[in-house]
Amino acid sequence: MQKTRIFKYIPVLVFLIVALFASCAHKSGHKENPCRTTTVSNRTEKQNSSRNKRVVNKRSTEKLEGQEIFERYGDAVFMVFTSDGSNAYQGSGFFINNNGLAVSNYHVFKGTGIGMEQIKLLGDDTAYNISQIIQKSEECDFILFKVECSNNNYIPIASLKPKVGEKIYAIGSPRGLENTFSSGEVSQWRAQNLMQISALIDHGSSGGALINEYGEVVGITSGSFADGSQANLNYAWSIDVVKPYL
């Protein structure tokens, strides 16, 4: 899935999916994340925007209903706008702490101009800049970065991966429809860090948050089939691919 314009599709055959993504799966035990990553030095900050304080939510000890998930974390997910100098693109992203630390898909940013990215928060017309790219991996399709804002809402990170059949919720901006909410289950793990999900996602959802019933982020929504069959086959990367760099 992509920035609205160039949707990154997951290969149709399962064995190709595994071959493509298994190389960045965690090994058992406590070994380092084998995803090839790149650390990028700080950028010069261009803008120091002040924002109103947002309510910061903590992990729930009980299962939450879908409406509670969205009420708590809807404004922790944002739209990402990028450009290659000629074309404009749109994707999604989300905060994982209250000081602007955020996650999205690498392919949302790939090939775009440094310094041309902007973030739009729900209910806020201000355009926020990215001050630092901390880590990125094309193989595991994630990018970890810092947005020039603070006191933002965020989604706590899950300590455990969801099991097949567990309820999950996706928040993103498919086709520019800001902060669309959908629900489903984990359909299967196709590689150790790549899950198949039944929650609906589409162009522009790339980089959005996949959340469990306890209000914890478990994945980064990333891709879908596009073979004309209308099959509800969507994919998300486990949030575990980011954990070694936090």
Language model features with spans:
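Bacterial N-terminal signal peptides that target proteins for export
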Residues: 2-11
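C-terminal motif of bacterial Sec signal peptides marking the signal peptidase cleavage site
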Residues: 21-23
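Bacterial signal peptide processing site
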Residues: 25-27
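N-terminal activation segment of mature serine protease catalytic domains
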Residues: 29-95, 101-106, 189, 245-246
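C-terminal cap/linker of serine protease catalytic domains
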Residues: 53, 57-69, 80, 116-118, ...
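Active-site-proximal beta-strands of protease catalytic cores
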Residues: 77-79, 102-105, 161-174, 211-228, ...
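Conserved active-site neighborhood of the chymotrypsin/trypsin-like protease fold
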Residues: 83-90, 97-180, 193-196
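Catalytic nucleophile loop of clan PA
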Residues: 94-95, 186, 200-221
